[in-house]
Amino acid sequence: MKKIVGHLIVLSLLCLINVNPARAWDAERRQPQSYELQQKYIHSFRQNAGFIHTERNDSIALLGDSLTTVLDSIGKYDEYFELKRVVIRSHILRGESRIAVAQSDMMYSKAQAMNHKFGMAMSLSAIGEVYSHMNRLEEAGTSLEEALKQLKDPSDNQILTKILLMQLVDNLLHLKNIGKAKLYIERINEYLSEDLSPVEQALFYNYNAYYCIQAGMPDEADNYLKEAWKLEPMLPVGIIRHLLIAEAAYYESKEEFEKALD
């Protein structure tokens, strides 16, 4: 009996000794998985020029906080703020406006305390989008313009710069502010096609078309839409929806209402 008890004690001690290595191994095993998820979400945001419709996936909202906590703890602040931006967008798309407002405010406070310009730009971009979804378009425009100013050297953050320019044009066209929209359209048109992804090209054509429709130039709008549709095989469904809406607006401007409804 004593021998059995002795063996059990030894086995128990061995199990206790091996708990920490097992936990460490599990943490090491999961770290690459966390990194892959972070990169997946950020890559999707960048490649789709901020117009991500797959972000309704619960995984982003559910895992986002834990992933950003990891980035914060290891001091990867550029990645932290960019991923936080993606998480806030996912909450907006899920209809969780209160969560999006709270997180964007906290994000801005953190970036401001750190004097982290990229983080402040990302935060203001998120705040601008929250305002847009709440139909507070004037406040949205102010936040987006301030976000653009925070980029010390826009050439270092071309992807975010392009996203902000498109957000601003979209905002100004909704406000029917054609004159100001034209200024940002001109900045958009400075980019060369070879420096743009297919999604970026399509969206640039799309916003040029919208501008031309509002400026009373339907034929030019039609030309931009035709160029955008050439990229259709390379575009995700969400971007194609944007083109369909622009096309409907074009037909409406031509008073071809049956085509607009198709």
Region roles according to the model:
Residues M1-G6:
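Positively charged n-region of N-terminal signal peptides that target proteins for export
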Residues H7-L8, S90:
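Short helix-onset patch at the extreme N-terminus, typifying the N->h transition
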Residues P21-D262:
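A "functional boundary" signal
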Residues L8-L16:
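Bacterial N-terminal signal peptides
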